[in-house]
Amino acid sequence: MTTVNAPEFVRHPKLIAWVEEIANLTKPAKIEWCDGSEEEYQRLIDLMIANGTMQKLNQEKHPGSYLANSDPSDVARVEDRTYICSQNKEDAGATNNWEDPAVMREKLNGLFEGSMKGRTMYVVPFSMGPLGSHIAHIGIELTDSPYVAVSMRKMARMGKAVYDVLGTDGEFVPCVHTVGAPLAEGQKDVAWPCNPEKYIVHYPETREIWSFGSGYGGNALLGKKCLALRIASVMGREQGWLAEHMLILGVTNPQGEKHYIAAAFPSACGKTNFAMLIPPAGYEGWKIETVGDDIAWIKPGEDGRLYAINPEAGFFGVAPGTNTKTNPNCMATLHKDVIYTNVAVTDDGQVWWEGLSKEVPANLTNWKGQPHVNGEKAAHPNARFTVAAGQCPSIDADWENPAGVPISAFIFGGRRADTVPLVSEAFDWVDGVYKAATMGSETTAAAVGQQGIVRRDPFAMLPFAGYNMADYFDHWLNLGAKVSEKAEASGNKLPKIFNVNWFRRDAEGNFVWPGFGQNMRVLEWIIDRCEGRANAVETPIGFVPTYEDLNWEGTEFTKEQFDLITNQDKDQWVTEIESHTELFNKLGERLPKALKERQAALLEAVKTGF
């Protein structure tokens, strides 16, 4: 039997007993209690270099940075192997995979039995959110992956201080992770152990996370999507707050007025770029600061305003496409102390990925560790960087404020070649919830004259809501109603809700809107709408700006181009709104009546108003 040997700084009997229980099940060779120290981090990195899991990069160009290459079968989140095992199938809903918790526990017990043999079990204590914040929550991850242990040090507040907050009886979310590759005595390990069979399992009622078979990011760093979205969304519903797949940014105008915005976009729609936006020419004196690029926990304050924290402490970003043009702040963040995964590497130890430079360097080693062949991808399309958020030059001064930052507006957006205009403001909270609930994004780049397939991704939460999506919509509606009363009593108001679409195309299939830094022009209008000083035109689908309502200083974007990305076509909108029925039917009887009514009213308005 493995000795638990909890260090003195762990004073939580229930936690120690749980570690012992999991050790008896998984049978690791030894247990290591992580303290989050620099010494521990370096020791684990050196261990992985010796094992061939990681390689040291050129320390002149990439100080303190390392590269891991995963097994080619273990490169992304596995949505089809991700389960919400609520007691009642209906509570998971039609958009989640469900299995009876008793059946799943039996299955997992079999898989986890002896799964850590020959390996070290790391006890990784972490806080999602600033330590001690009333918005934060603590998790403990037991993992046999040193890659997970070092990555969690960047992605969360990880280490000894967590135990001080936890004390002798504090609450924590138990997270168990194994790569599912036990080692027999004398068996040589592989560089990236994993198992073809994978399970990412959440038990919402008992707030547990069990992950088997994958060493990759979102499947293995259990504080991220598993705790911060799937389990936290369940907690938020019960406790009256929101856990959202949103970036948070701060905008300050030249007069010193500051607003915080939370925005939800599906994957590959530019969340990180938007969170770190640099204002373009014509916006001298404006400042954009980053609170978070992926997840927001939002709680109502006593004053009826909604306050958000970024529960993470790092960025786990997609590398391909990132460069000094698309995201200079992100590139500056990567100047040191980065863990790269599945990028390519040059013969002198520098990283490379598609989009980093026009020229492909000679003598490149691809993400599979083989010489790069022209015409093939050198970096995996989902290659990642893991880096501490504090290194970001645009990080907001209040990004770790335990009280959170007050949100003025929510923005929702997807990738649409037509139909949806550049920006529109919802008529009210219910209308905004309807628009977010039905937002769609094209899964394929639309060819000329051919629409991509629109995948409904409600609130950009389709893979991340830990309970029935219809109940999730209901929670948003109820929260709005509750907070609205409180806000009015304090002279405040609910955040406004906006929809954006940076991805409209012209007849030739080209993007019309330049995007990136130019999105600032839309952001300024949004803020001015929040302050009640910008004009808008009422249309059947919301309030939209005219060409004259936006600031065009420093650019030559024409009225004709603007009309191309803001025009609204009656037939397209009728088709669009009717297509929402498919999602609503899938969600069944639990769908809030208010959303069906909104659909009928919107359809009527579109048919008669254009």
From Swiss-Prot:
Presence of the UniProt keyword Metal-binding in the record: yes
Requisite cofactors: Mn(2+)
Domain of life: Bacteria
Molecular-function GO terms, alphabetical: GTP binding; manganese ion binding; phosphoenolpyruvate carboxykinase (GTP) activity
Chain residues that bind GTP: 268-273, 384, 415, 516-519
Example GO biological process: cellular response to glucose stimulus
Binding site for substrate: 77, 216-218, 267, 382-384
Family annotation (InterPro entries): PEP_carboxykin_GTP_CS, PEP_carboxykinase_C, PEP_carboxykinase_GTP, PEP_carboxykinase_GTP_C, PEP_carboxykinase_GTP_N, PEP_carboxykinase_N
Role summary: Catalyzes the conversion of oxaloacetate (OAA) to phosphoenolpyruvate (PEP), the rate-limiting step in the metabolic pathway that produces glucose from lactate and other precursors derived from the citric acid cycle.
Family membership noted in the UniProt record: Belongs to the phosphoenolpyruvate carboxykinase [GTP] family.
Name of protein: Phosphoenolpyruvate carboxykinase [GTP]
Organism: Acinetobacter baumannii (strain SDF)
Gene name tied to this protein: pckG
